[in-house]
């Protein structure tokens, strides 16, 4: 059964805050608002990460609908937060919450434009149905040091950096090996009763061998052992193989995050 979208969105925002606190780069500014004119928005600011793509730009506002205390005048206050740090592009990640049409209207009124190049679905898996996937690759849980040593083999440095930098209690790292060669990476984060599947990447030369489906299966198994009652993962519609792998493993779409972009 798919959980309530608004409740899940609020929990995912807490999870994001916690993950960020464990892998925070030195340039990242984090601000959690509680009530007031910015509701319960969570804001991250990083002048060094102003890429044109929402997934790699760390200048973000995480917002769940029209939160209590917010109004149209909240949006200029958001903009000022970024301008003060000399950030010229940021994204609002709008997840389900109260009065969504009102929230959309506030953002559009102040010049934010919805990014429709792709969608950002959040998928979840409930229940305890086992999932197995056979591959000729070897899947192993590994240390952070082994992840760091393997990162150069994967060709998708940003994703492997994300996996490597999140560490400590609650994080589990996995590699797929072809003999002694690491060819794919993935991580699991356990937060409250959520098992969050994150930071997956496969070397270009070893795609279509089932590495990620096998890594999904291994993380489902580990999350069950940790007592998680729900598994969650996030992807992009344009990464069709990622979305398809999650659906095959029993994940269902819970909601889509709407991405709004602001440029100075």
Predicted regions mapped to residue ranges:
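Active-site rim helix/loop that mediates acceptor-substrate recognition in acyltransferases
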Residues: 16-30, 101-103, 153-177
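A conserved beta-strand-loop-helix scaffold within acyl/acetyltransferase catalytic domains
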Residues: 157-205
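Conserved beta-hairpin
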Residues: 31-38, 102-113, 170-184
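A conserved beta-turn-beta hairpin within the catalytic core of GNAT-like acetyltransferases
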Residues: 46-61, 190-198, 207, 255
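Conserved acetyl-CoA-binding loop-helix of GNAT-fold acetyltransferases
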Residues: 70-80, 202, 208-225, 248
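N-terminal charged segments
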Residues: 1-81, 165
